[in-house]
A protein has these predicted regions:
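Residues lining hydrophobic/aromatic ligand-binding pockets adjacent to catalytic sites
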Residues: 1-120
Length: 120
C-alpha cells in the first residue's frame, strides 16, 4: 500500500520521499524551478484560488470550515482525484510538497488524509 507523507518544499529532498508531488496552485515563493526536486505538479487537486485566498485571511480561525470546503472541492473534482490515485498507486511512498510556513494548518494535511481514505 502507498504511504503518503507531507513535507515543505524548502526542506532538503530525501531518498525516503519516494514520488514527490507539488500540491500548491502557485509556484513556491523564492524557489527557482531548477532547484525544486519534484516529479509532478498537481494543480488540479489543490484548493481553488478563492478558497485559498479566504483561508489565508485567518488560517487558524478558518481551519475547520476550510477543511470541509476543501474536501467538498475534492469531491467535486472526483475525476482528477481518481486520476491522481491511479498515478500514485504503484509507488510505495508519495510525498506531497507544500510551501506554507504553517505545519499544522495547511491544505496538504487535508489532502493527505483525503487521499489515504480513498486509496483503500
Amino acid at each position: 500500500m502507498t504511504q503518503i507523507k507531507i513535507k515543505r518544499v524548502y526542506e532538503e529532498p530525501a531518498d525516503t520521499d519516494g514520488y514527490r508531488v507539488l500540491v500548491d496552485r502557485l509556484w513556491p515563493r523564492g524557489m527557482k524551478k531548477e532547484y525544486l526536486k519534484y516529479d509532478v505538479w498537481e494543480k488540479d487537486i489543490t484548493p481553488s484560488p478563492d478558497l485559498r485566498k479566504w483561508f489565508h485571511g485567518d488560517i487558524a480561525g478558518h481551519w475547520k470550515e476550510f477543511a470541509a470546503m476543501y474536501e467538498k472541492e475534492l469531491e467535486g473534482s472526483a475525476a482528477a482525484v481518481k486520476e491522481f490515485l491511479t498515478k500514485i498507486a504503484s509507488y510505495k511512498v508519495v510525498t506531497l510538497l507544500y510551501a506554507s510556513k504553517e505545519p499544522v494548518y495547511n491544505h496538504a494535511r487535508i489532502l493527505q488524509q483525503y487521499l489515504e481514505i480513498h486509496l483503500k
